């Protein structure tokens, strides 16, 4: 009798221990799901041949070894993708180092989760393992879609709708609600499945032990989602103000409102004067930068070398360095991705003033950030993204004037191309347009903030840039489809399909 009791206690202790391990592993798996798109679903399917290979051989060392090997391969896949995000020109970006530190968590969490699945298959049989793996796959899918980091093909319309929200409210709610709710559901499912499949009598406090493991997951999720925003606020990036108007129109308003920002941006052609003929531009920019106590970027025009051509230029003035610098437009339309109906582009008129291509530059603004500047249609060329990323900017800025494109469809296509550049470079893009959409596009290609009403009275767009960068492989927007293939930080190929529906 005593031996049977001891055996029963041993079995119950084993079951309760598994409950806690499964709860913690499931919660950690859900928390880490979605960092790299699609790998969660791929991994849940890939472990089936390994289970079949060790079926009927309850060697726990073999089980743990297979689980560790599989988790190592899975983590290496994540590592390759993360390294591709952060490793450029022989060094890691500062943002990627934090992501690389999560590899240890991936190894521990997924080793425990996969080993528990092996244990379920060998000891409990395939129905219990199937139920557990189904809940795991479901949790990965829900977490990927809710956190907007996976492919999310079935949730594509939801992602497009929520990408228009101001300030990324949906992402913040999903971080808290999605991770917490899915962890709760997975843990409860684990406990119910084990209770239904258990062949030995369980003690009365078995479910209480399962609740303890579930509370650990909930506390972990709550702590992470509460501490993370506070930590990011202490390490937030620069504050940028986009002023979609002519130079001088809102200067009095900016000075009276006493806006505290690191950078003020005016669109292409905002300054009516021309450099090389009137040097008052530098003086006016210096006075404004001193009053606002911030860096300034303003679009203007200047004559090229030898007074032969007209350059579209961005002027930059920093009150810290007291330096005035210029960045010229690199490319001229026709736009590379767009194809006209007849298959040929019109010739550029006015050959008396030929276009002189310039070079884009990166500038350091207040707060220690480096920004890369593109003018007009520069961002529609893939070569611009590749050349500007060689200078390691942390933020991309595009100033434009879309008065030349009265068609709303053309403006949508331009906006879709800017989203493509954000995905390809994995950098946020601030777009300040004289006419058109002034917006903030994050590294996933989602429009976080926008101001469509460009007509007077002009509305300022104030953006607080996040410190971290996110990325994606797939993005669709409206009538356009963009696909970027990357490996090791190098763009291997890209595809853009832009429809030409007539406006109704």
Task: Go through each PLM region and give its residues.
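Membrane-embedded alpha-helical bundles of multi-pass enzymes
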Residues: 3-231, 235, 406-407, 418, ...
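CN hydrolase (nitrilase-like) catalytic-core segments centered on the catalytic cysteine
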Residues: 133-134, 152, 263, 271, ...
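Residue-level detector of flexible, active-site-proximal loop/helix-junction positions
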Residues: 164, 247, 303, 331, ...
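Active-site catalytic loop in hydrolytic enzyme cores
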Residues: 81-102, 131, 135, 141-179, ...
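Soluble catalytic regions of membrane-associated enzymes that act on cell-envelope
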Residues: 222-336, 364-367, 373, 377-379, ...
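Alpha-helix C-cap/termination motif
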Residues: 57, 123-124, 199, 257-260, ...
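Asparagine-centered polar/low-complexity signal
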Residues: 190, 312, 398-401
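Conserved hydrophobic/aromatic beta-strand scaffold that supports enzyme active sites
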Residues: 31, 242, 314-316, 326, ...
């Amino acid at each position: 009798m005593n031996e049977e009791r001891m055996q029963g206690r041993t079995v119950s202790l084993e079951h309760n221990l598994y409950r806690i391990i499964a709860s913690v592993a499931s919660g950690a798996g859900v928390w880490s799901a979605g960092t790299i798109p699609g790998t969660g679903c791929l991994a849940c399917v890939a472990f089936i041949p390994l289970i079949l290979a060790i079926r009927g051989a309850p060697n726990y060392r073999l089980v743990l070894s297979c689980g560790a090997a599989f988790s190592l391969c899975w983590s290496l896949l994540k590592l390759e993708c993360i390294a591709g995000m952060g490793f450029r020109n022989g060094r890691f970006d500062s943002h990627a180092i934090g992501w690389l530190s999560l590899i240890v968590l991936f190894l521990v969490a997924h080793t425990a989760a996969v080993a528990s699945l092996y244990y379920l298959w060998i000891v409990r049989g395939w129905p219990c393992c199937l139920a557990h793996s189904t809940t795991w796959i479901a949790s990965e899918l829900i977490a990927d879609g809710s956190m907007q980091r996976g492919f999310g093909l079935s949730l594509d319309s939801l992602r497009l709708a929520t990408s228009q929200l101001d300030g990324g409210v949906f992402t913040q709610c999903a971080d808290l609600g999605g991770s917490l709710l899915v962890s709760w559901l997975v843990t409860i499912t684990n406990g119910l499945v084990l209770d239904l499949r258990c062949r030995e009598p369980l003690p009365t406090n078995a479910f209480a032990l399962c609740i303890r493991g579930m509370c650990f997951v909930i506390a972990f999720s709550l702590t992470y989602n509460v501490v993370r925003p506070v930590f990011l606020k202490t390490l937030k990036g620069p504050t940028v103000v986009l002023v979609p108007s002519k130079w001088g129109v809102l200067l009095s308003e900016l000075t009276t409102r006493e806006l505290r920002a690191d950078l003020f941006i005016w669109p292409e052609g905002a300054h009516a004067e021309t450099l090389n003929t009137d040097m008052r531009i530098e003086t006016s920019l210096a006075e404004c930068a001193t009053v606002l106590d911030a860096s300034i970027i303003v679009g203007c025009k200047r004559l090229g070398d030898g007074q032969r051509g007209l350059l579209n230029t961005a002027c930059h003035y920093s009150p810290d360095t007291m330096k005035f610098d210029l960045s010229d437009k690199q490319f001229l339309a026709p736009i590379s991705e767009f194809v006209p109906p007849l298959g040929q582009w019109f010739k550029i008129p006015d050959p008396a003033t030929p276009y002189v291509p310039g070079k884009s530059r990166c500038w350091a603004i207040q707060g220690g950030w480096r920004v890369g500047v593109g003018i007009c249609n520069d961002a529609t060329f893939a070569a611009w993204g590749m050349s500007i990323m060689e200078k390691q900017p942390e933020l991309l800025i595009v100033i434009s004037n879309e008065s030349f494109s009265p068609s709303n469809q053309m403006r949508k296509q331009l906006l879709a191309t800017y989203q493509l550049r954000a995905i390809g470079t994995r950098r946020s893009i601030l777009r300040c347009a004289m006419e058109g959409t002034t917006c903030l596009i994050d590294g996933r290609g989602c429009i976080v903030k926008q101001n469509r009403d460009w007509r007077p009275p002009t509305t300022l767009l104030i953006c607080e840039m996040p410190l971290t960068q996110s990325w994606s492989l797939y993005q669709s927007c409206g009538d356009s489809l963009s696909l970027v293939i990357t490996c090791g930080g190098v763009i291997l190929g890209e595809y853009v399909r832009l429809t030409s529906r007539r406006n109704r």
